[in-house]
Amino acid sequence: MDKLKILVVDDEARMRKLVKDFLVKKNFDVLEAGDGEEAVDIFYENKNIALIILDVMMPKMDGWEVCREIRKNSKVPIIMLTAKSDEKDELLGFDLGIDEYITKPFSPKILVARVEAILRRSN
């Protein structure tokens, strides 16, 4: 069986690597984007992305804009992974169609468990 592809979007390379390392251990194929514009490009170039893990605060295009753009054409599961912990930000995420909202700092093991739970329901 082919590995499921996950797109990890964060402007911090260290954060992308941390998340990627935990996902790769669970046999996921991970694509990375360092900003919102790159994320949208990668998403439309790779139609078989199973899930997106998305930061909010990034250069060029923030996570909210990425979510709006992707939701125009896709119901791919999206997990927001962000330092923005205000209730209004979390509610905005759900209004835009995200599936899960996780604030930093976070447990990578819990993140992976949530990824697996969402993918079990969506596939």
Regions found by a protein language model. Give the residues of each.
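C-terminal output helix
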Residues: 105-119
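Acidic, metal-coordinating helix/loop segments flanking the phosphotransfer/catalytic sites
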Residues: 32-51
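Receiver (REC) domain active-site loop signature in two-component systems and cognate sites
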Residues: 58
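Acidic catalytic/metal-coordinating carboxylates
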Residues: 35-38, 62-65, 89
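Short amphipathic alpha-helix used as the core "switch/output" element in two-component signaling
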Residues: 41, 64-75
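Active-site residues of response regulator receiver
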Residues: 10, 55, 82
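Charged docking surfaces used in two-component/phosphorelay signaling
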Residues: 17-25
